[in-house]
Amino acid sequence: MAKNPLKSRIDNIEGSRIMIAPLNWGLGHATRCVPIIKALIEANKEVIIAADGYPLIFLKKEFPEQQTIDFRWTTIHYGKSDSQVMTMISQLPKFTYNIAKEHFALKRLVEKHKIDTVISDNRFGLWYKKIHCIYITHQVSVQIGRHSIMNKMAYLLHKWIIERYDECWIPDFEGDGNISGDLSHKYPTPRNSHFIGILSRFM
């Protein structure tokens, strides 16, 4: 029987103190962290949940015994259809600032809480060379409108961010039977990518 791909990746994590940080865009990122947190606990890891807003409230209720950190993220807004491109471009300074802010905040958290590994669910700035850093996304190929050139540029930027991390976990299946379609399969996946199967809070 084939081993669960998520558990296979978790078995490769060195160190015991793991910080997991979901993006605060609704509850989707937080809910798909639930099976990851459960698998980490089963693997006898110490889990630190770093989030803000409703994701933090939700995960505190799901895992009341785990340590939590209020780790805020600056909201970025999408526009609609063609206006989405200009909306995203107008927010690039804010986007860049937020990545740098997260990056330096992570360094302080690592030293304060003795973190061995960080798992970031779509938070762009959480990589640090002194520890093992994992990025989770099902949307390798970011879609920001109907303009193929802009979508390709967004993919290349996202790929550059992803490759700052040691690993990229894609919550989908590779090849036939995948559910994310072009979001994860249109362009070549980053060299550090691993497909870990579908994630559900009911796993």
Please name every model-derived segment.
Residues R17, D116-T117, E167:
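Structural motif
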Residues P22-V34:
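A short, glycine/small-residue-rich beta-strand->loop->alpha-helix junction that serves as a flexible
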